[in-house]
Amino acid sequence: MAQSSPKASSRHTPMMRQFLRIKAEHPDILLFYRMGDFYELFYEDAERAAKLLDITLTTRGQSAGEPIPMAGVPVHAVESYLARLVRQGESVAICEQIGDPDNSKGPVERQVVRIVTPGTLTDEALLEERQSNILAALSCHQSRWGLASLELSSGRFSLTEPADEQALAADLERLNPAELLVDEALTLPTGLAVGPGLTRRPPWHFELDTATDLLTEQFGTRDLAGFGAQDHSAGLAAAGALLQYVRETQRSALPHIRRLQVEHGDQAIVIDAASRRNLELERNLSGGTEHTLASVLDSTVNAMGSRLLRRWLNRPLRDRTTLQARHQAVEILMAESLTEALRRQLRGISDVERILARVALGSARPRDLTGLRETLARLPDIQATLTGAGAPRLVDLAAQCGEHPQTLDHLRRALVDQPPVVIRDGGVIAEGYDATLDELRTLSENADNYLLELEQRERERTGISTLKVGYNRVHGYYIEVTRAQADAVPAEYVRRQTLKGVERYILPELKAFEDKVLSAREKALAREKVLYEQLLASLASDLAPLQDTAAALAELDTLAAFAERAQALDYSRPELRDGAGLRIEAGRHPVVEYSLDGPFVPNDLTLDDRRRMLIITGPNMGGKSTYMRQVALITLMAHIGSFVPARAASLGPVDRIFTRIGASDDLAGGRSTFMVEMTETANILHNATAQSLVLMDEIGRGTSTFDGLALAWATAERLARDQRAYTLFATHYFEMTALPEQCPGASNVHLDAVEHGERIVFLHAVKPGPASQSYGLQVAALAGVPGPVLEAAREKLRALEEESSRQRAEPDQLSLFAEPAPPPPLPSAAEQALSEVDPDELSPRQALDLLYRLKALTSGEEGADKKARGDAVDARSR
């Protein structure tokens, strides 16, 4: 243990013994130990926190003969410090003073009231408003993976059982958990990205029987058959470990966790981890949030809708009934001009989902409740807007919102219009709500009038015009006079405090009043706290319908955002059909188009049973990758319920989206660029089906030309001929354009460019057939490659082209896929005779004789040829 760690506690002060006892219960996390207006940290905790938070590390006297390292943060600013710690993957135990200092003979009684971890945040100040904060747990039971996830700030609880390590990696990439609980005896798959929030838990926390007992107790059921979870032992083991962890950290009931959802792999389009990154759904390839699909689609007006949109984006559905209901709702919002009215009403909605979670945990603040009150007051207007809407989904959501008149009335009676931030100082409960509180407040408030009267009376009685009556928390009420006038005070004044320039006194009458008033104020604050806790308990007992309201409001916001985007960006409703194929008319890349100042060049796509693969050639920067990605994004958008950037889109069933676009070294995993590329390619070849959409860009470029071309050819041939996946295959290997001759399901298309002098113009239009050239040197010039290098490259290119032409004329190295060239034919008799003659030496007579001789030789060869052709025909007929 480090030198700053405490030794045996028997030699410590009583307060430090208390600290060490509590710290021993939480050895692996930071302990915030409440002392007055500060949370203090000691020993190793202090050293770690000082480094992480950049706060002062000092010492607090000695205990057991050694100085005590100490650091602290003020209570009023604790949330900002907690936020910084959890972002760095730290967990913190909050230890509060729960005893009364005035009645404590030893150290004030303290206990840990909650544990803040990266995955269990619920406080508004600690959460990203538009991002879900997920706690996940991973188990392996009977050789099957189980993954459970919980968003504590909403109560959303689910489990799944990934089929293999690739599916597990895809699910973790989708969930992006802030904290992952793992059996400490479990060895994680190599290369699995788990982030900084990895928490190891004892193996017995993942036992199936324990998990089942915990879950049935939480939901008040005999078994878990009603959730469809009874056959998912690995998932249940993870869910049980997760629930136990949340109970330990929150130390309260969890009434907002009401159901467990089982997610099946075939319910959604599978997008593996690499493909999710390549498509830049929420994060771009640099790790930022700009220029992503979410940044274009998210025009939601409240945080609940934004988080729901992102959940949909990360898990596109395959259920056409659900998707068509969403498409119809978006269409009706546009057609009936409901979009703006609905968005205007939703704009003032509070984050009810998270407010209800804090209500359930007993941590809701007064302004949470006024936010809930204002939201409930808007529900009748929302329902009126959607009354008679021509989309069943909109009607259902309006009904799901409800109106909750009793809850609204309760909140209106209980709370003042503008309450303070916290309940601690009172002023939250409205006048008239509770007679006892009103009586105590009246007594307390009348004190002000009494004090003014006392001050005026004492000034007149003593003749001291500057005499004041005041109050502070330490010394209570006092009469204050300047030191120069202290000799004039009456004998019954009892000195209470001496300050620079003033003296403070107390009177028996003022002391009696102080006892009475302070007692009333303390009782009023205590009564108000009790009433507030009763209000929270009342709301918590009826959470289910309010949670349904929150879910409906979030979906309405998301659908209205889809409608707004469709109107603003000229999107169209996609058709989802049973038959195979993908047909997109005048499709555009949603993110690139949104970022351009000028118009985007649209392109068509047709893939069906007869045409399964496009071999895409063309220059760098010509738009090959953009074209491929736009097909994937249009497909994905259609499967979350959004309209799509195209004149029309008709899409058959899609089960997976794969992308093999770009690559870089995996230094941490010890994998080269080519190894990363081949690993991703192998995943596609093992898992793609006839309903998968596959994007392959520049396969084989990470190795030698012949190796790369061979791999690219074999990969494309397998996808087109055997797996028959919908494939867009971009390549710079011109030899690949010969593939359609051998695979009828493949076709060539290209993106062209034109040259104007030294300039190159990319047309970005997809055209039939292969490209004529790659324009690599022109692109290098655009990139700023120095002129001398370009000139040297041109000279080398000319030399290579001349060598290639010579080899075509005199082939001595075969093309990789060409048939062996036949041997050169022997010279004919006429050619042999002609080669032996010098024309300059012939007389006219000799020349005429030679002509007749050549004619005879030629006639004989023609006869031989005719005889050979006749023999061949006879052989075939036999």
Swiss-Prot record:
Picking any one GO biological process from the record gives: mismatch repair
Q: Which PROSITE patterns match?
A: DNA_MISMATCH_REPAIR_2
Gene Ontology MF term list: ATP binding; ATP-dependent DNA damage sensor activity; damaged DNA binding; mismatched DNA binding
GO cellular component terms listed in the entry, alphabetical order: cytosol
Q: Which domain of life is it from?
A: Bacteria
Any Pfam family from its record, for instance, is MutS_V
Give the compositionally biased regions (Basic and acidic residues).
800-811, 863-878
List ligand-binding residues for ATP.
G618, P619, N620, M621, G622, G623, K624, S625
Keywords, A to Z?
ATP-binding, DNA damage, DNA repair, DNA-binding, Nucleotide-binding
Query: What are the coiled-coil residue ranges?
Result: none
Q: Where is this region: Disordered?
A: 800-842, 859-878
Q: What does this protein do?
A: This protein is involved in the repair of mismatches in DNA. It is possible that it carries out the mismatch recognition step. This protein has a weak ATPase activity.
Instruction: Name the family.
Output: Belongs to the DNA mismatch repair MutS family.
Name it: DNA mismatch repair protein MutS
Q: Which organism is it from?
A: Alkalilimnicola ehrlichii (strain ATCC BAA-1101 / DSM 17681 / MLHE-1)
